[in-house]
C-alpha cells in the first residue's frame, strides 16, 4: 500500500521542460545543443532529454548540422 502512494506521488510531480518556450532549436544555438549531447559527443536519448519526439528529431538534425559545419565535435577524445 505504501508503494502505491509513493508511485502516485512521484508521477504527479511536474518537471521543468528541458527547452523553454522562447528557445528555438537551431544549429547555431551551440549552448542549447551542448545540453543534449554526452561528454563523449553522443546525442542523448529522448528519455534522458525528456523531449517530445518532434523536439528530439529537430534536435538531432540541428546537432548533425552543427557537426558538419564544425561548430560541434563529432567525438570528444580528450583522454
From Swiss-Prot:
- Complexes and interactors: Part of the 30S ribosomal subunit.
What family, per the record?
Belongs to the bacterial ribosomal protein bS18 family.
Q: What Pfam families does the entry give?
A: Ribosomal_S18 (PF01084)
Where does this one sit in the cell? Plastid, Chloroplast
Its cellular-component GO annotations read: chloroplast; mitochondrial small ribosomal subunit
* Keywords linked to the UniProt accession: Chloroplast, Plastid, Ribonucleoprotein, Ribosomal protein, RNA-binding, rRNA-binding
Q: What name has this protein been given in UniProt?
A: Small ribosomal subunit protein bS18c
Gene this chain is encoded by: rps18
* HAMAP family registered for this protein in UniProt: Ribosomal_bS18
In its UniProt record, a GO molecular function of this protein is:
small ribosomal subunit rRNA binding
Q: Which GO terms describe its biological process?
A: translation
